[in-house]
Amino acid sequence: MNTIDKTIEEVLRLAAEHFKVQRDQLSPDDDFFKKLGINSLQALDLLTRVEQHFHIELPDYELQGVTDFRTLAQRIQSRL
């Protein structure tokens, strides 16, 4: 498993834990708004948790248009 795959898997695990769903219900290309039925405030909660977990800060401009786990993981990787 390469680095981006590990990051994707960790993001999926964090999302599943945060929203109390089974990890196997989520896939990298899922739109998290649609798949989890969340709103923008709930997405911000997840992003805060992700930033804390990876010890990074993702600027707002890097998150515009990010709605799937794979793209979020790519943004995280760019900060590690």
PLM feature spans:
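Phosphopantetheine-dependent thiolation modules in NRPS/PKS and related acyl-activating systems
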Residues: 2-38, 47, 52-80
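Two-component histidine kinase catalytic core, primarily the HATPase_c
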Residues: 42
